[in-house]
């Protein structure tokens, strides 16, 4: 099983490292316009293979992506202080218009996994640039993991026993679906009551804020986030490579909302196999529609 990573900055190289540590694939090629960086990252990560899963790791040009089952796109500019989201979108859209056709020529059968930001809009653009090829965005997989982590932390349980989805935009307008959140198979409110733990609007607001502002808090302390998203990308990639039929909140074109956004989706060998629509409260549904509206506004401004 072969995976390509295009873009070897913090996110791309950390995703590659996670793939090797988890034994997600047998072959891994790193591609970057900065060939020296790609070579150095590939060599460094390859040194982890003998003490993990023996993955073959190397660097190369776009032609080396041939026969990859998944290509992860992390290439793009980072948002600078004072730069608007539209400015960032226009800059990264130009990068994608140059990059995606090269990738599709080299790996026409690969599932394209987009994680460059703004991920929902670039997922839409990549879908247009690679007609007929499966495209998914990392969406709110990381946001959902943050949500579950904070819920589990408050509940005092292992994070794998907390379940909840973050829907809509990967960004400011994202929606925490509290109505379907569960801990240990119980509705979250019931679990907290059974454990005599506080559960009120103040607690929910703290978890919401912690989920929504996690990236900003981490960036303030260390200038970038990459471990969480690197692990999330490895998880999504495995779902495709091994046809796991995993339910993940990836971003994909959603006709009823007119834009790519995150909903729970079944992910397998061909990318998104089906989309699930959890039952939401009226308030959650309204917020999801507002989130879609925010994305449509940016999409129209860019002319996508």
Swiss-Prot record:
Provide the binding site for NAD(+). Answer: 11, 32, 37, 76-77, 138
The protein's location, in the record's own words, is: Cytoplasm
Q: Which UniProt keywords apply?
A: Allosteric enzyme, Cytoplasm, NAD, Oxidoreductase
CDD domains per the UniProt record, alphabetical: LDH_2 (cd05292)
**Origin superkingdom:** Bacteria
- GO MF annotations in UniProt: L-lactate dehydrogenase activity
Does the keyword field hold Cell inner membrane? no
Q: Which Pfam families match?
A: Ldh_1_C, Ldh_1_N
Binding of substrate: at which residues? 79, 85, 117-120, 143-146, 225
User: Binding of beta-D-fructose 1,6-bisphosphate: at which residues?
Assistant: 148, 163
Top-rank EC class of the record's enzyme: oxidoreductase
Cellular component, GO annotation? cytoplasm
Thermal properties: Optimum temperature is 48 degrees Celsius.
> Its Enzyme Commission number?
1.1.1.27
* A single GO BP: pyruvate metabolic process
The entry summarizes how activity is regulated as:
Allosterically activated by fructose 1,6-bisphosphate (FBP).
Q: Which residues form the active site?
A: 170
Pathway field: Fermentation; pyruvate fermentation to lactate; (S)-lactate from pyruvate: step 1/1
| Chief localisation class | cytoplasm
Q: Which reaction does it catalyse?
A: (S)-lactate + NAD(+) = pyruvate + NADH + H(+)
Q: Describe the family membership recorded for this protein in Swiss-Prot or TrEMBL.
A: Belongs to the LDH/MDH superfamily. LDH family.
Q: Which PANTHER family match?
A: L-2-HYDROXYCARBOXYLATE DEHYDROGENASE (NAD(P)(+)), L-LACTATE DEHYDROGENASE
Q: How does this protein assemble?
A: Homotetramer.
Q: What does this protein do?
A: Catalyzes the conversion of lactate to pyruvate.
**This protein's name:** L-lactate dehydrogenase
Give the organism the record lists: Deinococcus radiodurans (strain ATCC 13939 / DSM 20539 / JCM 16871 / CCUG 27074 / LMG 4051 / NBRC 15346 / NCIMB 9279 / VKM B-1422 / R1)
UniProt gene name: ldh
């Amino acid at each position: 099983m072969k995976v390509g990573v295009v873009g070897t900055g913090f996110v791309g190289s950390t995703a590659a490292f996670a793939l090797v540590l988890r034994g997600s694939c047998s072959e891994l090629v790193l591609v970057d316009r900065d060939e020296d960086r790609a070579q150095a990252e590939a060599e460094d990560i390859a040194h982890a293979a003998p003490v993990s899963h023996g993955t073959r790791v190397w660097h190369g040009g776009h032609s080396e992506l041939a026969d990859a089952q998944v290509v992860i796109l992390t290439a793009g500019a980072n948002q600078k202080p004072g730069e608007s989201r539209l400015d960032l979108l226009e800059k990264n859209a130009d990068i994608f218009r140059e990059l995606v056709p090269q990738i599709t020529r080299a790996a026409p059968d690969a599932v394209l996994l987009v994680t460059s930001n703004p991920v929902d809009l670039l997922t839409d653009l990549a879908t247009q640039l690679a007609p007929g090829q499966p495209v998914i965005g990392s969406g709110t997989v990381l946001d959902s993991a943050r949500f579950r982590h904070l819920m589990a932390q408050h509940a005092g349980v292992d994070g794998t026993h907390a379940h909840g989805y973050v829907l809509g935009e990967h960004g400011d307008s994202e929606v925490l679906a509290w109505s379907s959140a569960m801990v240990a198979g119980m509705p979250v409110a019931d679990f907290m009551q059974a454990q005599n733990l506080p559960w009120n609007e103040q607690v929910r607001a703290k978890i919401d804020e912690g989920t929504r502002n996690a990236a900003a808090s981490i960036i303030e302390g260390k200038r970038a986030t990459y471990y969480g998203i690197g692990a999330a990308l490895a998880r999504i990639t495995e779902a495709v490579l091994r046809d796991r039929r995993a339910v993940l909140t990836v971003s994909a074109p959603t006709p009823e909302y007119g834009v790519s956004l995150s909903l729970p989706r079944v992910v397998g060998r061909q990318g998104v196999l089906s989309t699930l629509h959890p039952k939401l409260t009226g308030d959650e549904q309204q917020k999801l529609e507002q989130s879609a509206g925010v994305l449509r506004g940016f999409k129209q401004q860019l002319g996508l």
